[in-house]
Amino acid sequence: MRTYDFSPLWRSTIGFDRLFDLVETAQRAGEDNYPPYNIERVSEDRYQISLAIAGFSPDEVSVTAEQNAVIVEGNKADKAEREYLYRGISARPFKRQFNLADYVQVQSAAFENGLLKIELIREIPEAMKPRRIAINAAPSGTVHQLEGRAA
């Protein structure tokens, strides 16, 4: 009997009920882990993605919001050929995609201290929100006779 681990498929999803499970399984996925990132729930309907992209300038990074996804791409421009004795700061190009749940939208993106922070918000339309329906009761003294009425 074969077993399949589908946890890598859920690695970059935001706004789903199993958010904490998804973050846990992200560490076990075998794909490229560059750049490292955090996904945190700021409040009930707000999330933040933080990507560690030290060495990149805001001009070298793009954030694109599509239907149910956020795509972050970075491409470091080679300025001049340098001879490195040791190169520990990564400058390789990257592309990272985060899948979003329904009604989760990108609110803003900011670059601060080598971290790209993407703010997300879940805005459920008013028509989709649950609403309370008032129950009207008939006055207790009135009895309606249904028989004997003309149809």
Curated annotation (Swiss-Prot):
Record-annotated sHSP domain positions: 28-138
SUPFAM superfamilies the UniProt entry points to: HSP20-like chaperones (SSF49764)
Domain of life: Bacteria
InterPro entries: A-crystallin/Hsp20_dom, ACD_IbpA/B, HSP20-like_chaperone
Signal peptide: none
Annotated GO CC locations: cytoplasm
Protein name, entry field: Small heat shock protein HspH
